[in-house]
Amino acid sequence: MTSSVSTMHNNQDQQTTQLDFITLGIESSCDETGIGLYHSELGLIGHELFSSVKIHAEYGGVVPELASRDHIQRVLPLIKAVLADVKFTLQDLSGIAYTAGPGLAGALLVGCAVAKSLAWSLDIPSLAVHHMEGHLLTPLLEESQPEFPFVALLVSGGHTMLIDVKAIGQYKILGESLDDAVGEAFDKTAKILGLGYPGGPALAMLAEQGNYGAFKFPCPMVGRPGLDFSFSGLKTFVRNTFAKYPSKKEDIAKAFEVATTQTLMIKCRRALEQTKYATLVVAGGVSANLSLRKKLNQMGQKLDVNVFYPRQEFCTDNGAMIALVGYFRLSHGQHDTHHEINIKPRWSLEELSQIE
């Protein structure tokens, strides 16, 4: 379990008033149970996270049933821990936000059921939050924040997309992966090379030992117009190369990372040129990759573009981002209109409403 309370905003002696709006956020879309607490005046005041990655590691990937069972065990103790850290109670809450999708249906149901039950018992509103909107807006938790409009690159195990972000809730998808998400490609490539799960961090560490230029892998779809991605062919290229050169794991990992990060950088540059925006936001689990950050920062310097990321601990799934989005929307009057369980394992960002 990891626990963190924002020292910049936190004041444990702070007493709630009628003007305070305190949002509890619950994240349970996959294999991590995250709880966040966002205060209208103090910002993020606490968050807790438990990852069940060790449970799934022996299976080489996330087992949905095991993930759901673990969420059931963790969610209430984590909520209690977050509230206890800041000396608040359930009665201090103004609203509860939960991840309703996209994600694993069983895992989503756990967070949804807990959020709706608590909200009903406390007579406060609940709100369904889009998981990827949470990632997209996570940099707004930092002191240095992006201003709208901006281009967003969302890169995770389940998604790779470029988005035109004009305002909160006003999203247009410019391009997305036609097959494997980049995070999935990292995990599958790691598996081909015999690395452990989760594969992304293990592959990045192995790539640090590789020789640049020992192999040159293609950058998929950069030779054609548009902003869509495709990484399944690159994965096949890795498999064929590894079959010929099984002793060159480090160099293969390096070539794969170079090709993927170069592809992402090229597509980001196109999106920025197309929109004429001067700000890029990068979020999702793969945004933690240091090679990707280096490439995008270099691109930003050349194009005079400001590039923003979440802090490392908020690149992966977390409850803080759900509490943040929940605060934005709940404080503007948006909320669930009924207490029925409602999840959306498949849910497009373009379906979301703008905050008025």
From Swiss-Prot:
InterPro entries: ATPase_NBD (IPR043129), Gcp-like_dom (IPR000905), KAE1/TsaD (IPR017861), Peptidase_M22_CS (IPR017860), TsaD (IPR022450). Keywords: Acyltransferase, Cytoplasm, Iron, Metal-binding, Transferase, tRNA processing. Substrate binds at residues 154-158, 187, 200, 289. Its cofactor is Fe(2+). GO terms for cellular component: cytoplasm. One of its GO terms (biological process) is tRNA threonylcarbamoyladenosine modification. Binds 1 Fe(2+) ion per subunit. Fe cation binds at residues 131, 135, 317. It is found in: Cytoplasm. Its EC number is 2.3.1.234. CDD domains: ASKHA_NBD_TsaD_bac. It catalyses: L-threonylcarbamoyladenylate + adenosine(37) in tRNA = N(6)-L-threonylcarbamoyladenosine(37) in tRNA + AMP + H(+). Pfam families: TsaD. Gene3D superfamilies: 3.30.420.40. It is an enzyme of class 2 (transferase). GO terms for molecular function: iron ion binding; N(6)-L-threonylcarbamoyladenine synthase activity. PANTHER family: TRNA N6-ADENOSINE THREONYLCARBAMOYLTRANSFERASE (PTHR11735), TRNA N6-ADENOSINE THREONYLCARBAMOYLTRANSFERASE, MITOCHONDRIAL (PTHR11735:SF6). Required for the formation of a threonylcarbamoyl group on adenosine at position 37 (t(6)A37) in tRNAs that read codons beginning with adenine. Is involved in the transfer of the threonylcarbamoyl moiety of threonylcarbamoyl-AMP (TC-AMP) to the N6 group of A37, together with TsaE and TsaB. TsaD likely plays a direct catalytic role in this reaction. Belongs to the KAE1 / TsaD family. HAMAP family: TsaD (MF_01445). This is tRNA N6-adenosine threonylcarbamoyltransferase. The gene is tsaD.
